[in-house]
């Protein structure tokens, strides 16, 4: 292109289904400021054109976007040809079409009427289904929308990231309580006493068991909780609070975890035991490493359909193939007991902790990424929405960037001015809420055993849930199955 062509003006005719706008603009500025026009006017047949016709989603908005290259125009300010929500969505489409940057955070709190939901889905499909976009779908989902239009994977994600959730806590007082976060109360009690025969009890009745609750896990596949105690495993239906099945065992259960498909579970004790939850058959993974005799399995997680990771009391991490009963690999990561093991939500990291440090590895456990050292680590958890790791260190709650290892927030639970001082015990647990803005943890005072809820984003006062008579030993977060949207999603998942 010669200098005269490069510096000449060009006519742009912007057409939508109902309207046409015409612009006469500087070709040089278009090329310099917009990749779309740079490619069009230097590489394609339009290189020598004086007039170009472009089909756009909205000619007025497209004109505004193009003119922002030539003057200081706030493109996010509605120019008045449609309502605010529609303007913002069409603006994104125009910016995406012309490959012009758009501030995605402008969409985060957007509310659209039912008739705008399909347009919203079109925009989200372009952006991608990240956490903010999932929350946008949840907040705008029409009451009678046909959920059958969504693929199963999206339905599961919507259910797991519901903003309406319950907290489930198990205790040495032999109870499991399901707490409703909005009412700050528990809506039912499940008193657990191991019995040889399964009996049905109404929700307002108590059923007494022999053994303390040691550990729990939740499966969204069937909306079930599994609990382990010193002598028994129970499978619970969340919807009606009934015991579905129970399995007796003659060993102490240190940790329990559902398989990804929800059809089996793995228990950690001296060995790994896998239970088929349909028929109750138990398979023991009991091959031993050299020098592993006498070690116990302290924590466990299911990494994929067939692979199980567990931590041992001698500081070793093992990976087992659940089908072949063989150890795939093992690694000495510490000289002391492994207390926790967890995958990041995006499955790119696996974190392992002992008393004084958390070590982050890549997902296949071949490369150590970083170490986070502390004084007395009790428990940790990944955020479901950000690159954030939260941990309990002594009396402190600490927040780290899990990619860099940088500490960016600390909260001290200990209040020396209070006569009823709170503290973390060795059994304390910590989790994020599904939205990632709240941290849920267990703690104790001299006379009380508590569940705390802290909105660390807003730095609100902590809400404490009281009800357990003895120390809380397990904690999990579940979608609120009474929420109407959650009910519809769960019913759709069950019927697919």
Swiss-Prot record:
SMART domains: WD40
Record bears the keyword Repeat: yes
Membrane spanning stretches: none
Domain BTB per the UniProt entry, residue ranges: 8-78
Residues in the signal sequence: none
Swiss-Prot/TrEMBL keywords: Repeat, WD repeat
WD repeat ranges per the UniProt record: 149-189, 208-248, 250-285, 291-330, 333-371, 422-464
Domain of life: Viruses
Annotated family: Belongs to the mimivirus BTB/WD family.
Protein known as: Putative BTB/POZ domain and WD-repeat protein R61
Organism: Acanthamoeba polyphaga mimivirus
Taxonomic path: Viruses, Varidnaviria, Bamfordvirae, Nucleocytoviricota, Megaviricetes
